[in-house]
Swiss-Prot record:
Keywords: Disulfide bond, Protease inhibitor, Serine protease inhibitor. It comes from Hyacinthus orientalis. Serine protease inhibitor. The keyword NAD does not apply. This is Bowman-Birk type proteinase inhibitor B2. Transmembrane segments: none annotated. One of its GO terms (cellular component) is extracellular region. SMART domains: BowB.
Amino acid sequence: EQRPLCNECFICDRSGDPRCLCEDHVPQCHEGCHQCEKVDTRSGTTMYQCRSFEYYDCAN
């Protein structure tokens, strides 16, 4: 199973499977996201952010 990659992890738990609260703004939340929120950006482009504690691969 390939997990989404998070570039800006807000909180990361690396014990066992890495899990994090991801701060990335994306065009569409991944299908496993349980709490997807719309984010208004400075450019006016509508983006989304997954606000649930998910199994991400932490890039940082």
